[in-house]
């Protein structure tokens, strides 16, 4: 795995840690697979929007993020716009954003 892939997965893993809620049976509500899947579950959509926001902050282009998340560019732009709306209306999203930002503070923007 190269440095870029390591950075991508560390951002995704940090967002999962910030957004995940452990279930009673020991499973997790959000996984890597659910982030890149087509799930419309609210928690997964919020986590996906947070991934897009954090990756834009890290310096990735919308096109790269769309490829990573297996989405169209338009859907990725919509997720980025949705993250602003979630931030404005959801306390849980604001808490997850602050936690993920703290975990990703050592991630410096990359310029390719």
Regions found by a protein language model. Give the residues of each.
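Short runs of predominantly hydrophobic/aromatic residues within well-ordered alpha helices
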Residues: 8, 12, 48-49, 62
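Short, amphipathic alpha-helical "recognition" segments used to contact nucleic acids or chromatin
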Residues: 43-60
């Amino acid at each position: 795995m190269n440095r870029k892939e390591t950075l991508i997965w560390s951002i995704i893993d940090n967002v999962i840690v910030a957004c995940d809620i452990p279930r009673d049976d020991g499973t997790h509500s959000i996984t890597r697979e659910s982030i890149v899947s087509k799930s419309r579950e609210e928690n997964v959509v919020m986590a996906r929007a947070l991934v897009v926001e954090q990756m834009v902050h890290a310096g990735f282009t919308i096109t790269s993020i769309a490829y990573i998340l297996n989405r169209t560019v338009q859907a990725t732009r919509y997720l980025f716009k949705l993250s602003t709306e979630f931030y404005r209306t959801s306390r849980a999203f604001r808490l997850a954003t602050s936690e993920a930002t703290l975990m990703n503070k050592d991630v410096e923007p990359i310029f390719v």
